[in-house]
Amino acid sequence: STKKILLALISILIFLNATEYQLSTHILDINSGQPASNVKVELYNLDQNRQWVKISEKFTKKNGRIADFLPYEKTENRSFGVYKLKFYTKDYYISHKVDSFYPFIEVSFELLKDQKHYHIPITLSPFGYSTYRGS
């Protein structure tokens, strides 16, 4: 029917216009065993003067993820250089009535020209954290 064809065309157009993102993050609270939702995360770039410049601020979703840092549409538009993510963990733990040692966590990393996507996960507890390059 015409409705089905129209819906299929709309779906294809949405898919073709979907923005891809070069950087994502995920926070898992290993104290509770749950994703850490509503955590403020700031993204900074180290400029040519060796100064940190804030380029984005987002909050983790219910699943503890932010999937949409650094949008790009073509290979030549990929960002590269030194970046850092700043996770406001104390605010998260205050909202859960838990004492925490770290007021925030900063993770610095380098994006290379030849890499498509970077994922920076954090496993977090009130008195420790771990991170790695995910996929």
What are the residue ranges of the model-derived segments?
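Compositionally biased low-complexity segments at domain edges in trafficked proteins
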Residues: Q115-S135
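Sec-dependent N-terminal signal peptides
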Residues: I5-F15
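Beta-strand-dominated extracellular/periplasmic modules and repeats
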Residues: T19-E110, H119-P121
